[in-house]
UniProtKB/Swiss-Prot annotation:
Function field: Participates actively in the response to hyperosmotic and heat shock by preventing the aggregation of stress-denatured proteins and by disaggregating proteins, also in an autonomous, DnaK-independent fashion. Unfolded proteins bind initially to DnaJ; upon interaction with the DnaJ-bound protein, DnaK hydrolyzes its bound ATP, resulting in the formation of a stable complex. GrpE releases ADP from DnaK; ATP binding to DnaK triggers the release of the substrate protein, thus completing the reaction cycle.
Zn-finger segments (CR-type): 139-221
Pfam families xrefs: DnaJ, DnaJ_C, DnaJ_CXXCXGXG
Keyword Transport: no
Keywords: Chaperone, Cytoplasm, DNA replication, Metal-binding, Repeat, Stress response, Zinc, Zinc-finger
Gene Ontology BP terms: chaperone cofactor-dependent protein refolding; DNA replication; protein refolding; response to heat
Domain notes: The J domain is necessary and sufficient to stimulate DnaK ATPase activity. Zinc center 1 plays an important role in the autonomous, DnaK-independent chaperone activity of DnaJ. Zinc center 2 is essential for interaction with DnaK and for DnaJ activity.
Subcellular location: Cytoplasm
Organism of origin: Mycoplasma mycoides subsp. mycoides SC (strain CCUG 32753 / NCTC 10114 / PG1)
Source organism, top-level taxon: Bacteria
Full protein name: Chaperone protein DnaJ
Per-repeat ranges for CXXCXGXG motif: 152-159, 169-176, 195-202, 209-216
């Protein structure tokens, strides 16, 4: 069957940035992960999504894919369609060289060990939080709500009504695995497979927990407080350990990953990593007279004495009023104010008379040099 284009799988354009690809992957992973999506095709869809992300988030692989398409990973650089038999053959040879080769395949496709034997960490969760400039500057506490896979509050994840309802599977003797003999030419090999009686759990539950119907887990809506410290920057992450989904096999919870983004602002802009740039409107009269004005900033109102005859597009620098240079530290960048002198469109009669008097008496004439 022809493989689907990796960009189409993730729903991004061929010019998408790494950040856009990561965001698309996280969105699809939340939608199709088998722990959260019980539809029959969720597993295959997730495999397809992971495969696409693995290539497009690797600069070298993406370059090869853009040039050669799926052919870049076929043949000698790809994996055999008969991979299972190939791995079975070498995994039973007992050679240290082949055994390490088999481990490489296990890293990609998982080993034959049962979930019951391996205690793995729960699925991590990624959440995007968009901050205003003021929230980014001073830090903020946010409450987020998530549907998280959680251990049942009655059976504590066992899935049984009581401990006495749990017994060891007699078919696999609690390992979750059974040995299957396989003939390959003149050779006969043994292969581990998931126990078909306990479905790899290694245990049999007589009476299932009524609260979770024997699953041991369920999705629960949770409120989580996230402290976003001052000094953080857009596109940085905050990790809350073990605040993600519960493990499906008695491991620790996954993590909650917070991706920080900055809301668009018509007023403020980050420059030089630590400085804040803003454009500020100033009256033409204040500019001419060099008056003291009040500048409204994220820190509140600041009094500032204008230099006489300041012009538009000149800059005012207010030290130590920019972003904090590092998390929870007090050193800051600067606030850079770009001056925009505003002239009124309409004047009252008195204003017009006074300005006409000044015009008649002034010797000021701006220079315009058009000589090349």
């Amino acid at each position: 069957m022809k493989k689907k284009d990796y960009y189409e799988v993730l729903g991004v354009s061929k010019t998408a940035s790494e950040q856009e690809i990561r965001q698309a992957y996280r969105k699809l992973a939340k939608q199709y992960h088998p722990d959260l999506n019980k539809s029959p095709d969720a597993h295959d869809k997730m495999v397809e999504i992971n495969e696409a992300a693995d290539v497009l988030l690797d600069k070298d692989k993406r370059k090869q894919y853009d040039q050669f398409g799926h052919n870049a990973f076929d043949g000698s650089s790809g994996f055999s369609s008969n991979f299972a038999d190939f791995e079975d053959l070498f995994s039973n040879m007992g050679s240290s060289g082949f055994s390490s080769f088999t481990n490489i395949f296990s890293d990609f496709f998982g080993s034959n060990k049962s979930d019951y034997q391996r205690s793995t960490k729960g699925q991590s969760v990624s959440v995007d939080i968009y901050l205003t400039f003021k929230e980014l500057l001073f830090g903020v506490d946010k409450i987020i709500e998530l549907d998280l896979l959680t251990n049942c509050s009655v059976c504590f994840g066992s899935g049984a009504e009581s401990n006495s309802d749990i017994s060891i599977c007699n078919n696999c003797h609690g390992t979750g695995e059974v040995l299957i003999q396989k003939n390959m030419g003149f050779f006969q090999f043994q292969q581990s497979a998931k126990c078909n009686v306990c479905n790899g759990a290694g245990k049999i539950i007589k009476n299932k927990c009524k609260n979770c119907k024997g699953k041991g887990k369920y999705l629960e809506r949770k409120k989580i407080e996230v402290n976003i410290p001052k000094g953080i920057r857009p596109n940085q992450q905050i990790k809350l350990s073990q605040k993600g989904h519960a493990s499906i096999n008695n491991g620790v919870n996954g993590d909650l990953i917070i991706d920080i983004y900055l809301k668009e602002s018509k007023v403020f802009e980050i420059v030089n990593n630590n400085d804040i740039l803003m454009t500020y409107n100033i009256s033409y009269l204040d500019a001419i007279l060099g008056n003291e004005i009040i500048i409204k900033t994220l820190d509140g109102d600041i009094k500032y004495k204008l230099p006489k005859s300041i012009n538009s597009n000149e800059f005012i620098i207010i030290n130590n009023k920019g972003l904090y240079k590092s998390i929870n530290k007090d050193k800051r960048g600067d606030l850079i104010i770009k001056v925009n002198i505003v002239v009124p469109k309409n004047l009252n009669k008195k204003e017009k008379e006074l300005i006409e008097q000044i015009y008649e008496q002034t010797s000021f004439n701006p220079e315009n040099n058009i000589d090349q």
